[in-house]
């Protein structure tokens, strides 16, 4: 991680630059895959699964037998954790549900507003080196609360043609209607256009690599709505001398291991804490299963020492991080002054 001490405000813009991605060269390849999926349906999707995920599939749909098998394979401790997470996510999002309102704008004129769940939604859950069952819950639980009648999930299988059991169990717990073994651009195309197996949906949600992001943006031009364009994941931690350096380092690494293009930033008023966090990051990094990914993303990351908390807040509002963690003595006061955070620049 790069260490920056007392940067001048005029240098903040340069200092806070995010890792850039040139996706212009991807459009031709992504467009060709989407066109093939639109024209040839399941056949094209399975061909791309063989090409990119190195698996020969007989069908795309996850069967009820596979769901039962997955449930039996998930350890009881993980089941308990998934159920607890589902309950917490449900409780939080249930409170957000819009019940509608009526307003009489003038005598005899009443306007009203109501929220209706999208009938069919598609959820994309990436594969890779770690099963993102938390993503399943965070996408599917709100969809269920909103009243979506059909929740379709696509996720890439492994080389044996299996989806990770934890993903299937989380999907079952969250109320997903149908699950398909498809990843990447071909999965986005299948949900956007519909195939013999995969239903056409009205809106697609979920993270993915740069190919998935380009595919989502391309299908959004004509076929289907999407949540939003997304970039690499990021987190900023604001901390003072009262913060626990082990916790701060763990918070930074938890985001750094998302991908090699992730970015993590510590902004602190304490040089002692900065140095302790720098040590802890290296100490904890060595014990991470995904240490190589985290180590690469730390090349994009920064430890920044500022003169006071007002400067920390100003820098934060200019950076507008996707995720922000405040670890200070007066955390509520600091949080109240942050106006630009939770801006989904990342996935």
Question: Across the structure, where does each feature detected by a protein language model lie?
Answer:
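Conserved small-residue-rich beta-alpha loop and adjacent elements
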Residues: 103-169
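Short loop-to-beta-strand entry elements in the cores of soluble alpha/beta enzymes
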Residues: 205-207, 228-239, 254-278, 294-304, ...
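C-terminal core of ALDH-fold dehydrogenases
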Residues: 318-347
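Glycine-rich phosphate/diphosphate-binding loop of Rossmann-like nucleotide-binding domains
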Residues: 145-162, 240-247, 251-289
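Conserved NAD(P)+-binding/catalytic subdomain of aldehyde/semialdehyde dehydrogenases
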Residues: 175-263
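Short acidic-hydrophobic, aromatic-tinged amphipathic segments that line or gate anion-handling sites
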Residues: 1-7, 178-183, 303-308
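N-terminal Rossmann-like NAD(P)+-binding subdomain of aldehyde/semialdehyde dehydrogenases
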Residues: 1-119
